[in-house]
Amino acid sequence: MSRYKPSGLKKRLNKALKSNSSVPAWVILKTNGEVRFNPKRRNWRRNDLKV
């Protein structure tokens, strides 16, 4: 990716970075195992970002 990035693109990339995390352990405990994984999880090699 190029070094120069417009601020709008940087914001979208940052949002994608932050939303690409697993479910915290306390959430799994609080929901009694109902929520185990993040269905929106994305792998950088397999899935392409449309930003």
Curated annotation (Swiss-Prot):
The keyword RNA-binding appears for this protein? no
Keyword field contains Ribosomal protein: yes
Q: Which InterPro entries match?
A: Ribosomal_eL39, Ribosomal_eL39_CS, Ribosomal_eL39_dom_sf
Instruction: Give the GO cellular component terms, alphabetically.
Output: ribonucleoprotein complex; ribosome
Protein's recorded name: Large ribosomal subunit protein eL39
* MF (Gene Ontology): structural constituent of ribosome
Q: Name one GO biological process term.
A: translation
Q: Which UniProt keywords apply?
A: Ribonucleoprotein, Ribosomal protein
Family (UniProt): Belongs to the eukaryotic ribosomal protein eL39 family.
Against Pfam families, the record matches this protein to: Ribosomal_L39
Please, which domain of life does this record's source organism belong to? Archaea
